[in-house]
Amino acid sequence: MAPGGGGGRRDGWPARGRLLLAALLLLLWTRAASGQSSPQQSVILGMRLASCNKSCGMNPDGIIFVSEGSTVNLRLYGHRLGEISSNLISFTEVDDAETVHNSTNCLELTKDLVVQRLVNVSRGNTSGMLVVITKFLRRSENMKLYALCTRTRADGPWLKWTDKDSLLFMVEEHGRFLPLWLHILLVLVLLVLSGIFSGLNLGLMALDPMELRIVQNCGTEKERRYARKIEPIRRKGNYLLCSLLLGNVLVNTSLTILLDNLIGSGIMAVASSTIGIVIFGEILPQALCSRHGLAVGANTIVLTKIFMLLTFPLSFPISKLLDFVLGQEIRTVYNREKLMEMLKVTEPYNDLVKEELNMIQGALELRTKTVEDIMTQLHDCFMIRSDAILDFNTMSEIMESGYTRIPVFEDEQSNIVDILYVKDLAFVDPDDCTPLKTITRFYNHPVHFVFHDTKLDAMLEEFKKGKSHLAIVQKVNNEGEGDPFYEVLGLVTLEDVIEEIIKSEILDESDTYTDNRTRKRVSMKNKRDFSAFKDADNELKVKISPQLLLAAHRFLATEVPQFSPSLMSEKILLRLLKYPDVIQELRFDEHNKHCTRHYLYTRNKPADCFILILQGKVEVEAGKENMKFETGAFSYYGTMALSLAPPDRSPAHPTPLSRSASLSYPDRNTDMTPSSLAGSNQFGSCILGQYVSDFSVRALTDLQYIKVTRQQYQNGLLASRMDNSPQLTLDGCATCTENLSERPELPVVDETTTLLNERNLLLHRASQEGTI
């Protein structure tokens, strides 16, 4: 068997290939030179380390080293290795790796390495496992170097391999550096420290600084004491984390080394350290500290501080770097949803009763719910028409409803123009049949509108400001082809918001439903019935009530410019209204509806009076097309008849008049009703100092109205001037009259044109209502 070179490293395959190629060329050259044919021989090309039962490996130079007293498996590569026996392979001792190539003769074979057998030969006879047993070195020796020797036959000469891949170091086995009892004790101590560091890492880092503050304020006395100990070092989160991790890694590494030295086998040392660290260093301590982290952390605070001090040179700079890169530690902060869910999940374990939990939940949901979620739908609201008369029937309906704030609508329920408070009716007599507008405009309560997406917390703040405890919910409707408009959806009250907070319904004697959503009705046990107190249908009211007189007085003083306090004092106006024949009644003849006495004004006939309808309905006919429409109470006509137009002013060119006679207040942007349209337009003309109406007004029902003639009005103006200037004598009446005639003229309007425009507006609105 001839040596052909070899190598024992994976990265030495190119060198071995070159050696193999050189050996084959040398073999062929030898055979060709001899000219003789010889039988094919076994060839060893290389050797490498396969395994051993003790520490072994390869040094940086590629030389195999093994421990003394171990069994080593060497992998051989070559040709026809199945024909090689153990007596053809041996080792010889050499001085050093540098001089091994000086000689190829194996002068003396060593007995320190015993070649056992060649096993596991491959099917192609190109590789096999050589088992070698190493003996112990002498006391004075700590290392020996051996070279591989082979021969071709049992009686042939030994040849020494000269490359480094065929060398083998045998080193002294290192013994334990500590006594066995101390070694075992140190392993146990390190195992305990590993568990402490692992448990503290989980227990302390799981304690949020915010949670520690909460425990300090509301925990038990023991918990407060523990929290006060832990909180200072827990604030230094990254520093504490780095110290615990460095200590844990240091202890686990030391434990592995000690176990390797104690057991001696690499696999057993790794398995033992893994089992010990996992069970006693991770599972048990973390299971304990996850439940009692506060107590464990407080009782081991001294040990933690010691390790923080010992690891300060390394852990503190790393913690500062983490603070710079990652920023400050993000503390646990519960938002609204998480806090609410935490209360629900922990309900079986906390001492909160269901009502308290509902209140907390309701308060937390204020910012997530809108007024549309809790409002009362518009069709379910109790409302009053703006043209309602506060008679006994209306008053009884209001009292039976039980509500203290009632919306007032005009034309349709979505057009809310006022709010009526029940306390406003304290001095209203049902027998007076006072118009509702008189009351609402006298108190002029603000109407509070909110959008449907307003959050409940914002709505509560608005209610707390004291503006109103009732709001109208609206939204912008931009559906369809027309312009966007505000659509009223319903009402929301302070009671609705409070009910949403406490998650319970507040029922009183006025509630009709227990809930706006379920629409479950309340049983009315104590509901009062006022039907027995209502007036008979055939009962007539001959005289005007004081309340109606007051309403007419206030209406004339505030809505009709000719009776404003700047022209006629309120005292004189009241005296004028109490003058005989100023307030009149007209009985309607059902059998002769078009009789002459039903006409208050006749087209193209002179008239010298002003008329204000108090009760009843009239029909107005105007324009070339003879358009007709109906008006009711508090519509007025003939303001131009109260004063003569100047001679130099043509009726065909009137002075423009601002529409200040509307029944709506100036600061409101509301639609006009037919009554307000009729009352806000005075139509007629002045011909030769005499007022001639170009319209007709005919009664449709029994009427009660105020009729003021021109002479009565002029006398009232004169009386007001004399009342304001009591120093004037009778001799100064002429001067007073002159001054009166020189007073600023009230502007007039083209009444027919105005009437036509208002009629078109009424027809357009009626068509819209029919479409809806």
Curated annotation (Swiss-Prot):
Residue numbers carrying Phosphoserine: 658, 662, 767
Other facts: Shares weak sequence similarity with the cyclin family, hence its name. However, it has no cyclin-like function in vivo.
Organism: Rattus norvegicus
A single GO BP: enamel mineralization
Lineage: Eukaryota, Metazoa, Chordata, Craniata, Vertebrata
Domain (CNNM transmembrane): residue spans on this chain: 176-356
Membrane topology: Multi-pass membrane protein
Protein name per Swiss-Prot or TrEMBL: Metal transporter CNNM4
Regions that enter the bilayer but do not cross it: 238-258
Region of interest (Disordered), ranges: 647-676
Record PROSITE patterns: CBS (PS51371), CNNM (PS51846)
